[in-house]
């Protein structure tokens, strides 16, 4: 069973990226050996270096590590628990749980913890649970953990995949853009250069671009954020800054990097890096599908085989109506136990 009270408690803590310490402090105390009915053999608190920390719970020497992240995107949204008819109810009676992190990724935490308790109760002693900070803004916790040198054969990362194994995930590419115009009275635009118009021209070129596609990953997509141009309405904009974020396919990953960094008049491009598209382990007998989001997986380099799966859907993650069905959490708990047994039974099918 999912620990509904634990779920309520962690959802009630604001762990927006940068504020994870409150949640990690709580979990370190709540999940410590001797506190829960099924003890973990060891709990380590690992500093990330930015004021946050990772938590690593282990039973023996882990061959399989369950992993997800403690941070959430803003804004913080307190939890609510509802019956199937939409009425409010106590946590233990809930059909659906709403609030920030309910599926991304605090729902993953409680589902994985439930699986760990089941495995420990069965006497298993070769698994662990890794809770990371900073996933939403750069995988800082994952990068810090990789530096510890820890290694294990299998990693199961919890993300909202509708309890399907992610067969592949798109890559990411991020660029900062600066457009340089020349300020002038807006009544005489022919004597100046509008940075806004330069940006619009660039966006028209991007929208018209024929970006390569591939069968496994589909289309490359992009989004513009951090858009700034502070000119008054009666002055041509002298500058505009923004960031553009691509979700790339294998066919388009190198193409996007080359196209974005071509020299252009009055435009500066600063690459911010990203992750390459990747394929992940799937197992026979388990549902699988590709996903279009990133995760900590590329940065956790000490693991031989990586699986991404978990309860909830990415279609509500990061939204104000983020939610997860309790039945999906229960299903995920059972799924994680089955995956553990399949992996330790050497039933790995392909990567």
Task: Locate predicted features.
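Acidic/histidine-rich catalytic neighborhood of metal-dependent amide-processing enzymes
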Residues: 106-174, 214-215
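Acidic/His- and Gly-rich active-site-bordering loop/insert found
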Residues: 1-101, 308
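Short, conserved micro-motifs enriched in small and acidic residues
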Residues: 95-110, 135-136, 193-196, 323-326, ...
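Phosphate-handling active-site elements
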Residues: 88-95, 115-130, 206-215, 319, ...
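Short glycine/proline-enriched coil/turn segments at helix->beta-strand junctions
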Residues: 2-3, 32-33, 42, 58-64, ...
